[in-house]
Amino acid sequence: MMRSPLSHLAVAATLVCIAATPMESGSLSLRDGSRLWFDGTSTIRAWRCTADKIDATLHSPDSAVIANTLEGKKVAGTVQVDFPVATLECKNGTMNEHMAKALKATAFTTIRFTMHSYEFTKGSAVSGTLHGTLQLSGKTLPISVPVTFGAAADGGLRVTGKVPVQMTDWDVKPPTLMMGTIRVGPVVTVNFDLQLQQGRAVAAQ
């Protein structure tokens, strides 16, 4: 359920990373403090799940990806982000179990986002949209994620954004609890705040 949106967000966030792809090494790492979380609703209260781990593979031939991105200049590059379904944490054991079941975690252990292209949006801030596909619960569909780029400490790149995800589009049935008396809403908002730096690609935790 919520997992689905999360993965999207995880996707969205990673796409952003593409703009921050590293220099000649062609790799980029996520700094500690990077966050990815999902907000949803139910018939009784709002809820939130966080992503404890993101595995990103970023490649670019450009040696000044961060600088060019902050100037609104496009660079060539590819991005693939994998998110282990098992790392989703909703701070509620029952919710975690229902999420895993809704996302078919046993059969499809990973949520994957692959970026195919992106574009900048003219304006006072450097923003844009990442276009790619999201593979979730065994189904792959196109997705577009709006993002904003900013400077981070020590020459890094900060990428923020959020995107609503309709779980049923990926054939994810919103969970129900307490014999159907508690129902989770079908739309989840994926939020991300990523701190990126040039260097060896690693898993952000």
Task: Label every PLM stretch briefly.
Residues 1-10:
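Bacterial N-terminal signal peptides that target proteins for export
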Residues 11-13, 17-27:
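Bacterial Sec-dependent signal peptides at the C-terminal "C-region" and cleavage site
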Residues 22-205:
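Low-complexity, acidic/polar, glycine-enriched regions of mature
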